């Protein structure tokens, strides 16, 4: 398990261009191009919910679920099998499993290569 440098960075912007692009503080960026599992936090009487999203084909009705700009990344790890786990303040959680044929996710940082 490998902890990533994006912990404690805030989400500046979330976009959909060639996948789900999460722009973070300090010129860091996560690009997800394979299906992800997004855990939504509980709200009011509604419990937490898991939603599978294909970042290359996000329907209009799922786009509001990706509205967590401003949230701080509280936990960022890569499991030994290549699974990316991201937790955000406010309760959102993203899990991206590896794909044998394509890069499922990429992490870029101006100061990290």
Across the structure, where does each feature detected by a protein language model lie?
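Surface-exposed, interaction-prone regions used to assemble/regulate multi-protein complexes
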Residues: 1-113
């Amino acid at each position: 398990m490998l902890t990533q440098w994006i912990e404690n960075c805030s989400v500046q912007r979330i976009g959909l261009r060639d996948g789900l692009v999460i722009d973070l503080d300090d010129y860091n960026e996560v690009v997800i191009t394979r299906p992800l599992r997004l855990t939504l936090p509980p709200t009011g009487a509604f419990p937490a919910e898991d939603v599978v999203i294909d970042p290359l084909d996000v329907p209009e009705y799922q786009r509001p679920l990706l509205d967590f700009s401003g949230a701080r990344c509280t936990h960022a790890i890569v499991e030994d099998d290549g699974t990316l786990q991201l937790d955000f303040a406010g309760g959102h959680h993203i899990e991206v499993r590896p794909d044998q044929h394509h890069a499922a996710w990429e992490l870029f940082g101006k100061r990290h290569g």
